């Protein structure tokens, strides 16, 4: 079973199996001072790929926590669940993704975009209905920056005016301007400061924080920060080292003062202090803010209140 991403709502934590025999959402609960407890598994009615997706945000909660959206990379569709006030899930729709091998999702208000990695890859947009339906937006499908670019994540900035896609194999970041109808422009391509840009997040000041895996080279990973500009990206902090290996997933606290990257190749988590202007400073000299254990390969992460949840296979 290939556990994929994490999402957090109230005291419920979600991940998915990405199983080829049938993808499922695994639901856990927590409480003050208590360990995570397994609650239930909920079928998506789609299928996975039985392997790692190599992406961030394959499972996302809507802004107000009412909807949970999951990719089914093996059946090329998206499952949408209603989330009740206790964190229980009810499947409301399955929708073709507009491509093959969907691996990442993003939501802003009623807009949802999916990143399809199969073939040459694309992004495709939908309107999220009050009933949980996803209606394709005409003319919203856009190509990526080229062929075999190794996409990792799609995400909106805080305003919803720009879509961002990281391209691992090309070491580029693609930017799409989104018009008032929710339709993106052709991609504007920016060269990543560091190699193998992977996961990213926007902090509360709309600084773009991007993890850089540097091809998994030992001790070479980093995180960079950027400011979005009309003509592309302005670098704020360039490749601030984790001193760890394969930094792939990155999350920022709600107030934006801290960010954390999971170092899959090292079994560690690296923390950063984030200034309003995007300046990044590692919290420790060795880049180790947390240890998930030898061979644990931490992948995705989610923040809930003062808790950092890290998905690590043992």
Describe every region a protein language model picked out.
Residues 113-128, 135-199:
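Aromatic- and glycine-enriched pocket-lining scaffold segments that form the walls
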Residues 38-50, 90-96, 137-145, 185-191, ...:
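A short beta-strand motif characteristic of beta-propeller blades
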Residues 27-35, 81-88, 127-134, 176-183, ...:
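Short loop/turn segments immediately following beta-strands, especially the blade-tip
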Residues 18-20, 30, 73, 83, ...:
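Short loop/turn segments immediately following the C-termini of beta-strands
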Residues 8-31:
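An edge-strand/N-cap motif at the start of beta-rich repeat modules
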Residues 15, 70, 114, 165, ...:
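Residue position within the beta-strands of beta-propeller blades
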């Amino acid at each position: 079973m290939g556990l994929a991403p994490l999402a957090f709502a109230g005291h419920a934590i979600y991940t998915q199996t990405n199983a080829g025999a049938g993808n499922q959402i695994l639901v856990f609960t927590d409480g003050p001072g208590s360990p995570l407890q397994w609650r239930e598994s909920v079928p998506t009615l789609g299928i996975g790929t039985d392997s790692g997706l190599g992406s961030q945000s394959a499972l996302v909660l809507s802004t107000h926590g009412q909807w949970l959206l999951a990719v089914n990379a093996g059946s090329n569709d998206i499952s949408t669940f209603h989330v009740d006030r206790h964190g229980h899930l009810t499947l409301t729709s399955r929708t073709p993704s507009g491509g093959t091998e969907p691996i990442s999702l993003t939501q802003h208000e009623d807009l949802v975009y999916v990143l399809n990695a199969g073939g040459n890859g694309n992004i495709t947009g939908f309107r999220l209905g009050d009933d949980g339906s996803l209606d394709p937006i005409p003319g919203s499908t856009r190509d990526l920056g080229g062929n075999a670019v190794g996409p990792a994540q799609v995400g909106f900035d805080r305003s919803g005016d720009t879509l961002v896609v990281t391209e691992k194999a090309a070491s580029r970041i693609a930017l799409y301007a989104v018009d008032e109808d929710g339709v993106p422009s052709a991609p504007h391509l920016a060269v990543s400061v560091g190699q193998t840009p992977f996961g990213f997040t926007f902090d509360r000041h709309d600084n773009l924080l991007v993890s850089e895996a540097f091809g998994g080279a030992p001790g070479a990973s980093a995180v960079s920060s950027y400011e979005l500009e009309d003509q592309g990206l302005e670098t704020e902090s360039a490749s601030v080292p984790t001193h760890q290996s394969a930094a792939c997933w990155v999350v920022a606290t709600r107030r934006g003062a801290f960010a954390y990257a999971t170092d899959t190749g090292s079994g560690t988590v690296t923390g950063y202090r984030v200034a309003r202007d995007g300046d990044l400073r590692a919290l420790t000299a060795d880049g180790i803010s947390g240890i998930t254990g030898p061979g644990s390969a931490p992948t995705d992460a989610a923040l809930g209140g003062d808790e950092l949840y890290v998905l690590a296979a043992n």
